[in-house]
Swiss-Prot record:
<dbReference type="InterPro" id="IPR015938">
    <property type="entry name" value="Glycine_N-acyltransferase_N"/>
</dbReference>
<dbReference type="InterPro" id="IPR010313">
    <property type="entry name" value="Glycine_N-acyltransferase"/>
</dbReference>
<comment type="function">
    <text>Mitochondrial acyltransferase which transfers the acyl group to the N-terminus of glycine. Can conjugate a multitude of substrates to form a variety of N-acylglycines.</text>
</comment>
<dbReference type="Pfam" id="PF08444">
    <property type="entry name" value="Gly_acyl_tr_C"/>
</dbReference>
<feature type="modified residue" description="N6-succinyllysine; alternate">
    <location>
        <position position="41"/>
    </location>
</feature>
<keyword id="KW-0007">Acetylation</keyword>
<feature type="modified residue" description="N6-acetyllysine; alternate">
    <location>
        <position position="48"/>
    </location>
</feature>
<feature type="modified residue" description="N6-succinyllysine; alternate">
    <location>
        <position position="256"/>
    </location>
</feature>
<feature type="modified residue" description="N6-acetyllysine; alternate">
    <location>
        <position position="183"/>
    </location>
</feature>
<keyword id="KW-0496">Mitochondrion</keyword>
<feature type="modified residue" description="N6-acetyllysine; alternate">
    <location>
        <position position="41"/>
    </location>
</feature>
<keyword id="KW-0012">Acyltransferase</keyword>
<comment type="similarity">
    <text>Belongs to the glycine N-acyltransferase family.</text>
</comment>
<feature type="modified residue" description="N6-acetyllysine">
    <location>
        <position position="43"/>
    </location>
</feature>
<dbReference type="InterPro" id="IPR013652">
    <property type="entry name" value="Glycine_N-acyltransferase_C"/>
</dbReference>
<protein>
    <recommendedName>
        <fullName>Glycine N-acyltransferase-like protein</fullName>
        <ecNumber>2.3.1.13</ecNumber>
    </recommendedName>
</protein>
<keyword id="KW-0808">Transferase</keyword>
Length: 296
C-alpha cells in the first residue's frame, strides 16, 4: 500500500484516472477536488505506483473518530481489475471494516469483491444502485465519444422551463439550512447526516430558490466527490419545475469553476429521469453504486 502524499503524485493520479472514465468517475471527481486544495482532508491510497491496479480515496484517520458516522467514513474505489483487489481492500490500513462505513464507486463489478470481504469480516451490507449521469459540458470535455446525439453538444438547448422570478429568487444555501436539506434527503435523518450536509454547504458551491417567505423551497448541493447531491424541493412547491431550474443553476455554477459535473438518480425515479433528459444530461454506461456496511 502506498499513500500518495505529493501534489505531483495526485496530479498524475488524476490524469491517469481520466483515461478510465466513465468507470473511474466517482474516484476521478474526488481526486480532482483533492487537487483543488483538498477541503475534505482526504487521502489517496494505491496498491502500487505508478502502475496502480486499485485506488481507494478515504478520510484521514483523525477525521474518522466516530465509528457510527457512515457519512464521514466514506471510501471511493476504482480498480482496473476488480477480481484481484480483495487483498488490497482487505488491508486494515486501507478500509476500517470495524466501523459503519460507505463505499462508493462507478463500478458495479466491484460488488463481488465487496460482498466477499464483508462476509469474511462479519459485516452486513446494503447496496444502492442508481443511474449515473454526466452533464453535457463535462461529457464534451472528458468523454466526447459518448456524445452520439448532437443535441448534447449544445449546452444551451437543454434549458429548464421558465419560472416566476418575482416569486422565486436564486440564492445559495447557508449552513443553517442543513436541517431542512437533511429532512428531505433519502440518506439523511440524523445528527451525523446533518453535520455532513452542513460541511458540504460551508465548503462547496450550492444553489437554492427562495420562496415568498424568503426560505429555501428547492436546492442542490455538491459533495466531496464533486457530485451534485442532496437536491430536494419542499412538498408544497413540487411539480412546478423548480428542481430542474436549480440543477441547471448548480451545473452552471460548477461549470464556471471548471469542475466536472455529474449526478445520479434512482432507477425508479421517473420524474428526475425525465428532467435529466430535458436538460440533456448524458446517461453513463456504468452505474452509481453505494454499499453501506455495518459490523454485525
Amino acid at each position: 500500500m502506498l499513500h500518495l502524499r505529493s501534489s505531483q503524485m495526485l496530479q498524475m493520479l488524476e490524469s491517469s484516472l481520466r483515461k478510465y472514465l466513465p468507470e473511474s468517475l466517482k474516484v476521478y471527481g474526488t481526486v480532482f477536488h483533492m487537487n483543488q486544495g483538498n477541503p475534505f482532508k482526504l487521502k489517496a491510497l494505491v496498491d502500487k505506483w505508478p502502475d496502480f491496479n486499485t485506488v481507494v480515496v478515504r478520510p484521514r484517520e483523525q477525521e474518522m473518530g466516530d465509528d457510527l458516522d457512515q457519512h464521514t467514513n466514506t471510501y471511493q474505489i476504482y480498480s482496473k481489475d476488480p477480481k484481484h483487489c480483495l487483498e488490497f481492500l482487505g488491508t486494515p490500513d486501507v478500509i476500517n471494516w470495524k466501523q459503519h462505513l460507505q463505499i462508493q464507486s462507478s463500478q458495479s463489478n466491484l460488488n463481488e469483491a465487496i460482498m466477499d470481504l464483508a462476509a469474511g469480516k462479519m459485516v452486513k451490507v446494503k447496496r444502492t444502485q442508481c443511474i449515473l449521469y454526466m452533464m453535457p459540458e463535462t461529457a464534451k470535455k472528458l468523454v466526447p465519444s459518448l456524445l452520439e446525439d448532437k443535441e448534447y453538444l449544445d449546452h444551451q438547448s437543454g434549458r429548464p422551463r421558465a419560472i416566476d422570478q418575482e416569486m422565486f429568487k436564486l440564492s445559495t444555501l447557508d449552513v443553517t439550512h442543513a436541517p431542512l436539506v437533511d429532512k428531505f434527503w433519502q440518506f439523511g435523518g440524523n445528527e451525523r447526516s446533518q453535520r455532513f450536509i452542513g460541511r458540504c454547504i460551508q465548503i462547496f458551491p450550492s444553489s437554492c430558490l427562495l420562496g415568498p417567505e424568503g426560505t429555501p423551497v428547492s436546492w442542490a448541493l455538491m459533495d466531496q466527490t464533486g457530485e451534485i447531491r442532496m437536491a430536494g424541493t419542499v412538498p408544497d412547491y413540487r411539480a412546478q419545475g423548480l428542481i430542474s431550474h436549480i440543477i441547471y443553476a448548480q451545473t452552471l455554477a460548477m461549470d464556471k469553476r471548471g469542475y466536472p459535473v455529474y449526478n445520479h438518480t434512482e432507477q425508479t425515479n421517473k420524474v428526475i429521469q425525465k428532467m435529466s433528459h430535458t436538460l440533456h444530461h448524458v446517461p453513463m454506461p456504468c452505474d452509481w453504486n453505494q454499499w453501506y456496511c455495518a459490523p454485525l
